[in-house]
Structure formats: structure tokens, C-alpha cells
Amino acid sequence: MGCTASKVEQEDTVRRCKERRRHMKEAVASRQQLASAHADYLRSLRLTAAALSRFAQGHPSLAVSHHTAPVLLTTAAPALAPTPTPPPPSSTASSSLPPPTPLLPKHQQAPPPPPPTQSHQPPPPVAVRAPRGGPRRLKVPHILSDSSVASPARSSFRKPVVGTPSSSSAWDWENFYPPSPPDSEFFDRRKADLEEANRLRELEEEEKARGYLHPHHLKEEDEVDDDDDEREEEMHCGGWEDDDDHYASTTTSETRSEEGEMGNRSECGFAARSEYGGTAPSEYAAAPLPLPLRRRDERSEAGDSSSTVTAAAEMRMVIRHRTLAEIVAAIEEYFVKAAEAGNGVSELLEASRAQLDRNFRQLKKTVYHSNSLLSSLSSTWTSKPPLAVRYKLDTNALEMESMEGKSHGSTLERLLAWEKKLYQEVKARESVKIEHEKKLSTLQSLEYRGRDSTKLDKTKASINKLQSLIIVTSQAATTTSSAIVRVRDNELAPQLVELCFALLSMWRSMNHFHEIQNEIVQQVRGLVDNSMAESTSDLHRLATRDLEAAVSAWHSNFNRLIKYQRDYIRALYGWLKLTLFQVDSNIPQEAYTSLISRELTTFCDEWKQALDRLPDASASEAIKSFVNVVHVIYTKQAEEMKIKKRTETYSKELEKKTNSLRAIEKKYYQSYSMVGLGLPGSGRDGIESHSFDARDPLAEKKTEIAQCRRKVEDEMTRHAKAVEVTRSMTLNNIQTGLPGMFQAIAGFSGTVVEALDVVCRRAGSVR
């Protein structure tokens, strides 16, 4: 029997199924360890931030030098979707365009754009955010005098349109786009708008002849503030009068002939274009800028002069922190953001307790109390301790869970159960086949020898029975294998792709936050210690110890995260590679495997190779070196505290001896200053005299006090030197260790993003 069992284990099919079971078992265990390591890594980021903040708060004297250059942070806004470039408007169309939208009022005007540079490129439109509560208006600058040769005349002509809280726009007549989107009445109003524009042009010409411009088309409530508005317009847009040459040079001849002054006087306006006309969303176009340096792409030279390309805006902020505590506070904020970036992966890996409890919804909990029977689907406990708690499987919850979709962990658990079942079935099938071969040999021997026919019939009956068992076991193995293939292709494949994309998103966000931290932390190179005499306290030492423990945990969890992720993908790849073979090895691979299985195997192979190529050793060494740096600081603080304690001990001893000497002097000499003088009544003829007594009984005690005082002074000198060494060591180690750690972790996260980006491109074929 043992020989038969060993022979079954040596079969290729059985060995392959055993390897599949082992790989899936490793994948399930690695997934659990990866979820735990991922949760611990996110937790260690928060703990490191808190410990670093407590450490920095204990060193308020570490200030940033005034000679240190500030940090320039560039935060790119989300890129806007490219908008299609419409064809340039024809002359007839431009002459019958609808009126432009109203602009912002004077009290909520956006700051004017900077003056154009010396280049001859047209300036980009400046987007502003409209207020809540209704449309706004803004007066454009007064027209220039006719004596200006380089610029055509301008007017403060206004036209009303509807403004929304999210966006507002004014027409840029040099590069005109139709409104977005035109309503059904657009073409009906074209003729009326053209007539209105001609009438207003005639009125403006009459007013220009009188030397001033009066806005006839404004509402009555706006006429009261015309004088104040005009004064503010001159202050707000006065710097634009020098740019008329530049603005006039960008106007095409067709626009100048058809629109005339209407195109020129709208050049001062602010434009925010929509999807059809290029309107940017208000949250991107009018983001608050402490130091506003917005950059837009130049106008496209490949298209017509009326087509523009607006790129995603970038916000640059110049940051200067004053102390180490402020630097660490800024770093702590991005530590928290980096930890929050991993929540999506935690959901997929089921790393939180809430997700673990969610998997037990199919269990109905019954709590037995002394006075009542409470039945609830939730796991909420009552205030009284129960007598007994029993769980029962709820089939309705199982059906609901199957309809909602399985989690990644449950998918792997079911695959492991299927693999165990498949291994037993294949093993049983192969053992039946071996027994069948033995019976065939026996039958052949009996027929050859011509023995008793009864034995021959029994052997044939056994062979028929074994053949039936072979068919049944083969069908069972085929059914189980088909179930595994179905779960692999329909559930596991999309879950792995989703996990890969979630990891890419997490590391991309972490890389962004670590890059900002790396920029901010460069300021520690300019730290100076304004108080070198400040000694270390117990709170400082505890904060340093907590920082060392937190960074050490970060280092350990970082290594665990990378290790278990590699183990997980390696186990999955090994299992997927074996699933490409049919349970029955006689069938060729191409006839069995599907396209999605081959693509999924290739996808996991590239994922495994990308993880193997990651330079995690450099990042791990950088974090470990910072742990060593903090440990050195902690050691120096311990030495300083030891010297301080010894100094305090000697000081107490000196104080004790001094007090004892003063007590003796007070008792026997009745004075603190009679030491070394004669005793009372020792003079001749009973005359009191104070002569020096060479036989001072307290000379020995005074000598001891002098020696103790010298010890105290020596220890105080050592303590002062130890304080200076500790402060200097702390400053130097922070300046060298902290930037190196953030530089390494930022570089590693960037490498992970590049590697996973290549892997995710391969995921398209898996989907």
C-alpha cells in the first residue's frame, strides 16, 4: 500500500496539483501578511510624524538662519481636459455674434494680469471666479486718445450676459470663440444683436465726439456709481495702456474690418472659456495664490490666430519656516496625507477591522441573557454580560454577498479550497488508474496462462468497476478545474488589475507628498542653535526615545511591506503558471488555456520582475541611518543626564556639609563669621577679646567642603561641555540625517511609480 501511495505522489499531474495547492496556500498567507504590513506601514507614517513633532517641540532654540534660501514649492493643478479647437469664425458670422457676458463689479474685481513681456506673443486670458448670488460686472478701461498711433481707440462698452457662481467670462475679440453652449434661441437673436451692436456703435461715436463716454445700456441702479467706477477703472487698468501695441498687433485684419472698435475695447476683459469656448473651471482658474505665479501655455502657432491652447495651471509658493518646529509641522501634514493615500489599498486588502467584521454578515448572532432572548444580525453587545452566545449561518446573507461581489481575500480562500479539493480528486484518480493498470496486468496473465475462468471473470468485473471510478474521478477533477478557471478569469483577474492600479495611485500620491517633504526639509541645513546652554530634560530624552522607536518601526514595516508584496506576487505567478496546464497532461497547453489566463500570467510576471528590480535597499538603509542618528542623539542625551545627575548629587552633598558647618558655627561661636577667632572670655583679666585661634576645630570640615566644592565645579564644567556637545550633535545629525532620509524615500517612491506604471499598461489586455 505504501508503494502505491509513493507511486501516486510521483505522478506529474499529482505533483503539479500539489505545487498549485502550495502556491495558493502561500498566496493566501502572503495576502494576510501584506494587509497587516500595509496597515502597519500607514500607522507608522502617522506615528513617525507625531514623534518627530514632539522631538522638534523640545528644541525651540533651533531656528532657521536668515541667510537660508526659501523653498519654492510647485503644486500642479489637475490638468484640464483638452478642448476641441473650433474653426475660426467667418466674416458674416463674426458680424452677427451674440453679446458678450458681463464682467465682475468693481468691488470684486480680480487683480490685473502682469504686463506683457518683451516677446511678441499674445497674452493668455486671465480667469477669475464669479461670486455667489448673481452676475457681476466690471468696467473695462477708458478708450485711448486718437493721437495714439500704435493703438486703436477703445471704449468702456458693456454687454449683459448671465454669470454663474462657478465661472465668469468676457470676450476676447482677437481670438473669439462662440459661447458655450449656444441655446436654442441663439440663431434667432443674431439679427437683433447685430442691430443693437450697430446702434450702440453709432451712440459711442457721437459720445466720443463730445470727449466722454456714457454707458447708455447700463441699468439705472449702476448710474449712481459711474464716477467712482471710472476712477477705479483708471487705477485698475491704467497699466494696460502701454500694451496697446501688443494687443493691436494680434488682431487679424478680418476681425478689425468686421468688428472695428468692439474687438479692441474688449481686449482688457477677463476670459474664462468653457468646453466649447475654452472656459476653465473656477477652482482651477482662480485658485488662491499667496505668491501668485500662474503659468499657461502659449498660444498654439500650428493653428489659426484665433485658436488658443490652455494648459493646466501651476501654483508656486515660496515657503520660509522660522524654526525646526515649523518645518516638522509642515512635514507632519504631508505624512498624514501620505497615510491617507493608502486607504484605497487597505480596502482592497481588507486591512481594517471594519472590513473584517463585514465578512461575518452571513453569521446570525444569538445572545442568551437571563431574562430575555436577544437576536440580532449585528455584533453590538449589550451592557449586561450574556450567559451564552451562539452563531448560525445565514444563507440569505450569503446570497446577498454573492450578488454584491466577492472580496479579494474571499476569492483567494475559495481558490485554496478548490485547489485542495482538486488535489484530492486528482490523487484519487491517479490511484485508481494505477490499480486499473495492475488489474489489466493480472487479466493478461490469467488469459495467457489459461487458468480458472472464475478468477478471470472476477478480474474483469474489477476492471469494469475501476473504469467507472476513473470516469467519475476524472469528471470530478474536470469540474473542479473548470470552477477554478472560472474564478481565476472572472474574479481574480479584475481584482489583481484593480489592486495594481490602486498601488500605483497610492505610490504616486506618496511620491508627490514625499517630494514636497524633501523640498521643505532642505531648510534644516540652515538651522542654527540660538541657545547652546539649554540642558536636556527628561521630556527631551523621552521624545528622542519615542522618535527612535517610531522611525525604527517605520523601517521595519517598510521592509515587511516590500517583502510580503514580493512574496504575494511571486506565489500568485507560480500558481498562475501552473494553471496554464491541463489537469490531464495529455491535452496540449494551447488547446486548454484562454487568452485572459495567458495575459494574466504575463501581467503577474512583469509585476514580479518590477518588484524584484525595486531599489528598496537604498531607501531602507536611509531610514536605518536616521534611526542610528537618533540613537546617537539619545546616547549623548543619556550621558548628559548622567553627568547632570552626578552634579546634582555633589551639589546636594556640598549643601549638606555647608549647612552642617553653619549649624556648628552658630551653636559654638554664635556667629557665622567667628570661625578661626578666639573663644569668648579667653582674654586677660576677664576682658573680652577676639583673637585668632590657630587651633581651629572646624578646619577639617572646611577642607572637605572645599574639596566637595571643587568636585561640583568640575562636574558643572563637564555638564556644560556635555550640553554643548549634545546640542551640537543634535544639530549636525538633524541637518545630515533628515534630508537624506526624505530624499531616499522620495526617490524610491518615484521609482515604484515608474515601475507600476509600466505594469499597469500591460493590464489593459487582461481586462
UniProtKB/Swiss-Prot annotation:
Disruption phenotype: Adaxially rolling and erect leaves which leads to plants with erect architecture and reduced lamina joint angle. Abnormal bulliform cell number, size and arrangement in leaf blades. Dark-green leaves with increased levels of chlorophylls. Reduced number of tillers, altered grain morphology, and reduced number of grains per main panicle. Reduced number and length of adventitious roots.
Domain of life: Eukaryota
Acidic residues bias spans: 221-232
Main location: membrane
Biased composition (Low complexity): 145-155
Chain intervals with Basic and acidic residues compositional bias: 201-210, 255-264
Keywords from the UniProt entry: Cell membrane, Developmental protein, Differentiation, Membrane
Pfam families: DUF630, DUF632
Keyword DNA-binding carried by entry: no
One Gene Ontology cellular component: plasma membrane
Membrane topology label: Peripheral membrane protein
Primary role: Involved in the regulation of leaf shape formation. May function by coordinating the expression of genes associated with leaf and bulliform cell development.
Protein name: Protein ROLLING AND ERECT LEAF 2
Species in which this protein is naturally found: Oryza sativa subsp. japonica (Rice)
